[in-house]
């Protein structure tokens, strides 16, 4: 019986310690810019002849006290990362990337939590 109680307490402790973050990414999108903390002109593809930079915007809910990272990927390679400290129940952050004309193809931005687990992932085409 004593071993069963120890096992139960250990299981509860492990579950509490490894619980997933309760917050979420309520919006995640690509845009050509951000004004007044809001995205303008959402896009899922851009042409190298029209724009050479793009922004990734996220609105985070109930993640105060945590960090999130925008991880920009191209051809399975990390091209840029930016980590943010979340300081409110509703928090909006964005990153921007200048793209070279030779970097055409699929780009992905992963939103990572404190443990670098993927909270959200979005892709766009650069043509």
Residues covered by each model-derived region:
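Bacterial N-terminal signal peptides that target proteins for export
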Residues: 1-8
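Sec/Tat signal peptide C-region and signal peptidase I cleavage site
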Residues: 16-22
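Short, compositionally biased P/S/T/A/G/V-rich stretches that sit at domain boundaries
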Residues: 22-50
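Aromatic/hydrophobic beta-strand junction motif of beta-rich domains
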Residues: 52-61
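Extracellular Ig-like/FN3 beta-sandwich strand-entry sites
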Residues: 65, 104-106
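Conserved aromatic beta-strand anchor motif in extracellular beta-sandwich/beta-rich domains
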Residues: 70-74, 111
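Aromatic sugar-binding surface patches on proteins
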Residues: 87-96
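Short, exposed beta-strand-loop hairpins at the edges of beta-sheets
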Residues: 99-100, 108-126
């Amino acid at each position: 019986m004593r071993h069963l109680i120890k096992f139960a307490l250990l299981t509860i402790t492990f579950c509490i310690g490894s619980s997933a973050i309760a917050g979420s990414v309520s919006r995640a999108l690509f845009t050509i810019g951000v004004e007044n903390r809001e995205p303008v002109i959402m896009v899922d593809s851009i042409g190298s002849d029209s724009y050479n930079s793009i922004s990734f915007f996220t609105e985070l809910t109930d993640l105060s006290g945590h960090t999130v990272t925008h991880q920009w990927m191209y051809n399975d390679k990390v091209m840029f990362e930016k980590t943010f400290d979340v300081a409110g129940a509703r928090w909006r952050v964005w990153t921007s990337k200048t793209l070279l004309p030779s970097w055409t193809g699929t780009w992905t931005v992963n939103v990572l939590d404190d443990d670098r687990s993927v909270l959200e992932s979005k892709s766009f085409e650069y043509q």
